[in-house]
Amino acid sequence: MKIYHFGAEDAPVLLLLPGTCCHWKSNFGAVIPLLADSFRVLCVSYDGFDETEQTEFPTMLEETEKIEAYLKTHCGGHIRAAYGCSLGGSFVGLLAARQNIHMDYGILGSSDLDQASPLTASLQTDFLLPLIYPVVRDGKFKAKFLQKRLDKCAKESGDYVKAFLKMFGDARPYVTMQSCKNQFYSDLITPLPDKIHVPGTEIHIFYALKMGAKYRARYQQHFAHPVLHEQNLQHEELLACHPEQWAHLVKSIAL
């Protein structure tokens, strides 16, 4: 795992946590310059997903422990805020629940927080991985009909699908199937406690309403007092398509 840092050393720390199988620069490259004038930006590059290392993603808890160890060593165990994109929101929840480091603000970016039994998680992972992994490795679907369907969807949906795929990243042949499998599976089976409440920590959630009404209940299940920022958008559409608005909202919360 690597941590890339930007901005002044004495500025308040903002931790950025990428989404599922995303490359850190593709995920956050457009917004880091918008944040680095106000924060010391730390962007996590997970084990198995950084081109400068030969590693594999272990488990959510092992990766969380590495993040905590870094923050204790380099930030005194206290940061201003953490933003988690999709899967990264699970890390924000775990960091809050474990209370091994302290963050003043935890922000989840329309995370689904899906959880499943080991059997169900294994079945879901085994079904999705052959579809998703070629996109990670080669930058496109292996099945031609899926690629054609995606291309058609991208044309019909305007900027969102193109922006989302760009955020996902280009072809990355260095990422192993095992890393993707471990990340998918581990995220599903790692429990996130209910009614998380940490004195001195505010939880904010960018709630993409087009994902569905069930997520409101899910956010309120896992967090005792979440502040929901409702947006009539799709999953992580604010970050993918409106980086300036996204950065403004993050600053309005954490500054």
Regions from the PLM with identified roles:
Residues Y4-E53:
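Conserved HGGG/HGGXW glycine-rich cap/lid loop of the alpha/beta-hydrolase fold
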Residues L42-A81:
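Active-site loop/oxyanion-hole signature of alpha/beta-hydrolase fold enzymes
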Residues G84-V92:
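Gly/Ala-rich beta-loop-alpha elbow adjacent to hydrolase catalytic centers
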Residues F91-L95, Y215:
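Hydrolases whose catalytic domains are alpha/beta-hydrolase-1, hotdog thioesterase
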Residues A97, Y105-V136:
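Flexible "cap/lid" loop of the alpha/beta hydrolase fold
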Residues S117-P118, D138-I196:
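Conserved alpha/beta-hydrolase catalytic His-Asp/Glu region
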Residues Q178-Q221:
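Conserved serine/cysteine hydrolase catalytic core
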Residues L233-Q245:
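Catalytic histidine-centered segment of alpha/beta-hydrolase-like enzymes
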